[in-house]
Amino acid sequence: ERLKAKLYAGMAMHGITEEVADEIYARIQAFASFGFAESHAISFALLVYASSWLKLHYPGAFLAGLLRAQPMGFYSPQSLVADARRHGVEVRRPDIAVSGVDADLEQLAVVEGLGAGESGAAVIAPGGMDSCRAADQPKVERFRRGSPDRSAEHRRDGGAAVRLGLTSVNGIGRTLAERIVAERERQPYADMNDVVRRAGLTVAQTEALATAGAFDTFGLSRRQALWNAGYVDSLDTLPGTAVDAAPPELPGMSDVELTLADLWATKISPGEHPISHLRGALEEQGIRPVGSLGEPDDTRRVRVAGLVTHRQRPGTAGGVTFLNLEDETGMLNIVCSEPMWKRYRRIGRQSNGLVIRGRVEYADGVTNLVADRFDPLAAVLPQSAATVARSTSRDFH
């Protein structure tokens, strides 16, 4: 409306008046009612298509880019890594000998544990299909949960793994990470004490790197590295006063302990999803993996278990609350009616690990679970308490 007079004046200068001018204005006005939303939809669709193409063909590079851009977006680094791992991307822990400041790609031939400063054979076989680069593509088939995953056929960076950066470690900021990398490029680190001395680490920073497995490259287990963290020279000790004490024979960490250590140090478990360690016990109780649900389960009542990644209650949803539940097989949308949420609100909000009972809804390739009961995962499986305590969620955003 603010431009109406100016528009009519301009049209009059070009001989467009009366009914013709009114018709042009009416059409512009009608388009304005949805043109803003349409332009946003088109620009967003382009971003979605480009992102989807990259995720399919270069999932390793796509993951590394997302990790470099943190904090951002809907999904946590843990969920991003878990999804990439399910699609065949190898994710490696921080390594003081090879990690950069941020997450990056490295050749699969660079094997962990080679020793500080060493590198493996650098050979990357070409991957993917040339037809993927053609402008004209066949129609995409309808998605069905549980159908064979053929994404590996399209992957073009299959010879690369994602290496977590040093900034992913708790307490290691960008300035310190840059100093660690700069010192390493000047001269490879000889041992753990050399890293601490040259990079100027505190005991807390050394312990965080040890917990993350960053010193594994020196042939140390995580417990040995943690023991050594209290003896090496650091900013917390007087120069030359550290005791050169060999660590005692310490038992290695179990797979569960390694996962918990990863989560504490980086909030990411690159090896295994935390719920995978509980799968046997869950199956004994008839609790199914979320990735096993699909069209054949439509309307069935089932129980699933996992870690809550999101809680949302949109103002336009009529009181319905939505949760995302994740286990080692994938994510599941949980739909909670207003009465159900009121009944289980305390458990639903306070427990990051849940066992959820409900009925499956399957439509257009999307599986939802309409929940009718919550139980804390730690109450059903007490051994899960430490895992649940390490998990976090993003709520009501």
Describe the residue ranges of each PLM region.
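Noncatalytic, beta-rich nucleic-acid-contacting surfaces in large DNA/RNA-processing enzymes
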Residues: E1-H397
